[in-house]
Amino acid sequence: MPDDEVSKEIIMNIPLREAKLSSRKRRADTSISILRNYVSKKLKVDTSKIWIDPKVSETIWKKGREKPPSKLSLKIIKLEEGTTEIILP
């Protein structure tokens, strides 16, 4: 990824506490959707144009489906072409 394509790069602390309100068997899935919606709302991008790194997904699923982390610190890279990448810092 050349540097000229990056329009914005920030590190965000993303709260995932809302996932605890869903059923125990859906908490990790809910955390992924909360992550997408949070980044979409803050950076004003469409949720279909958000790419989540597999390592971020592994971090959420690390302790299993029922116990996702309550918050994550992630690096968000917004590209000029309109897509947004979510990676670990």
Curated annotation (Swiss-Prot):
SMART domains referenced in this protein's UniProt entry, alphabetically: Ribosomal_L31e
Protein species of origin: Thermoplasma volcanium (strain ATCC 51530 / DSM 4299 / JCM 9571 / NBRC 15438 / GSS1)
Annotated GO MF terms: structural constituent of ribosome
Protein name: Large ribosomal subunit protein eL31
Pfam family membership, one: Ribosomal_L31e
Record-linked InterPro entries: Ribosomal_eL31, Ribosomal_eL31_CS, Ribosomal_eL31_dom_sf
The organism's place on the tree of life at top rank: Archaea
Keywords from the named record: Ribonucleoprotein, Ribosomal protein
Family as reported in the entry's similarity comment: Belongs to the eukaryotic ribosomal protein eL31 family.
GO term, biological process aspect, one: translation
Alphabetized Gene3D superfamilies for the sequence: 3.10.440.10
Entry's Gene Ontology cellular component terms: ribonucleoprotein complex; ribosome
